[in-house]
């Protein structure tokens, strides 16, 4: 009888131990998952992000990992399809048993995948989307580092209008949730100047001909155009305008802040402004730390890094920062406890300081302007945003 009781108690103890074990964390390893576009329209971004993450993971593992645990990064391809993103999330969460989802790319894709993660208490950490849904409504498992497209344009539009004495502001935007965020941000910014858009025109996702839209903006004598565009559409719209001899001030969001704009669009892209938070790294950058990092990346992957490489690197670095502070007993709850009081200092890429709290999971809404000059992005403003106005060390409440 005593033997039977002892065996029963041992079995119960083992069951309790297994039940309380943290998914994705073992004695020697932490498993992270990421969903990227590796085969669709944003494959360039996805591959750069993956490489940046891999560089950070390799560096951390070479240094002994996090409290003795090595990081294992699993990356799935969504092809930039929200339905595939759900399948990828199901695989990573339910089969691979990841501890956390890191740097998932795409707004609709994150929205589709988050319910799968949250059902298993898996954090959505610093997704590659600047949509407000990445941190609103508040959820304990959502953490974002990207200020919203809406806020970027809300601040940048009146800034340029005042600096350049512009009279007629118009917009060309993608007819979807992303484009509408940019549209609304511009409207809110113009409202502070008692102005409204002089003209609005849109295009369907995948469009390649922008001649009718540009003609409409030119006919309205717009001297500034807010672009709710990403890569191909930014190049197409500006390129079309240049050919027509139409040269307003063009402003885009961080979605258009990529070296692909000037690499693919050429000289015609000079003068284009975009909001940004981290500098695009160049191997001949004036900053020695950026130059060193860029060349290290190029040596490893045999290609130049880009700003999405930086995002991937930052996301893993930020995860490691918090996970280290959570100590040996790394769980979702211990990680949240650290994150909810965490401050992150500016890094070599010129990113703004970030801070999180138990009621605010956006690190910073700050952004600044960069402009393409002589075929390269150059920062041309200080940071702006609600957080910049907040007292030192305190993020503005949302």
Language-model features, listed with the residues they occupy:
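Short, low-complexity disordered leader/linker segments with a strong preference
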Residues: 1-31, 384-398
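Beta-alpha junction/loop-to-helix N-cap segments that form part of ligand/metal-binding clefts
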Residues: 25, 31, 44-51, 59, ...
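Acidic/histidine-rich, surface-exposed loop or edge segments in extracytoplasmic proteins
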Residues: 33-41, 274-275
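Short glycine/serine- and small hydrophobic-enriched flexible loop segments
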Residues: 37, 58, 317-325
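Extracytoplasmic ligand/sensor domains, especially the bilobed periplasmic-binding protein
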Residues: 83, 97-201, 249-274
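Hydrophobic alpha-helical segments within soluble ligand-binding/sensing domains
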Residues: 85, 144-168, 207-211, 234, ...
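Extracellular/periplasmic periplasmic-binding protein-like sensory domains
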Residues: 238-312, 383-391
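Segments of small-molecule ligand-sensing domains
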Residues: 300-309, 320-377, 394-398
């Amino acid at each position: 009888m005593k033997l039977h009781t002892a065996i029963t108690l041992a079995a119960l103890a083992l069951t309790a131990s297994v039940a309380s074990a943290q998914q994705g964390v073992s004695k020697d390893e932490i498993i992270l998952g990421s969903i990227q576009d590796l085969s669709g329209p944003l494959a360039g971004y996805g591959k750069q992000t993956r490489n940046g993450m891999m560089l950070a993971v390799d560096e951390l593992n070479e240094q002994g990992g996090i409290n003795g645990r090595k990081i294992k990064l699993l990356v799935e391809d969504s092809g930039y399809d929200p339905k595939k993103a759900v399948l990828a999330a199901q695989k990573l969460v339910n089969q691979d048993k990841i501890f956390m989802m890191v740097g998932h790319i795409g707004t609709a894709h994150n929205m589709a995948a988050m319910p799968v993660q949250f059902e298993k208490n898996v954090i959505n950490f610093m997704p590659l989307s600047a949509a407000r849904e990445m941190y609103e409504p508040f959820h304990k498992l959502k953490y974002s580092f990207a200020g919203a497209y809406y806020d970027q344009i809300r601040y940048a539009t009146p800034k340029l209008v005042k600096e350049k004495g512009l009279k007629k502001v118009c917009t060309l935007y993608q007819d979807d949730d992303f484009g509408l965020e940019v549209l609304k941000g511009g409207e809110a910014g113009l409202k502070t100047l008692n102005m409204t858009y002089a003209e609005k025109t849109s295009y369907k996702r995948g469009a390649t001909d922008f001649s009718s839209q540009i003609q409409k903006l030119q006919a309205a004598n717009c001297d500034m155009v807010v672009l709710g565009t990403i890569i191909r559409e930014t190049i197409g719209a500006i390129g079309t305008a240049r050919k027509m001899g139409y040269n307003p001030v063009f402003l885009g969001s961080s979605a258009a802040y990529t070296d692909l704009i000037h690499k693919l669009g050429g000289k015609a892209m000079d003068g284009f402004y975009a909001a940004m938070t981290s500098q695009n790294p160049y191997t001949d950058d004036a900053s020695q730390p950026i130059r060193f990092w860029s060349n290290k990346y190029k040596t490893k992957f045999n290609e130049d890094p880009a700003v999405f490489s930086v995002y991937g690197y930052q996301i893993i670095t930020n995860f490691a920062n918090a996970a280290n502070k959570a100590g040996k007993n790394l769980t979702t709850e211990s990680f949240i406890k650290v994150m909810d009081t965490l401050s992150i200092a500016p890094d070599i890429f010129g990113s703004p300081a970030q801070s999180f709290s138990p009621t605010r999971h956006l690190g910073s809404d700050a952004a600044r302007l960069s402009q393409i000059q002589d075929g390269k992005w150059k920062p041309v403003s200080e940071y702006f945003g609600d957080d910049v106005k907040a007292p030192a060390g305190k993020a503005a409440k949302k």
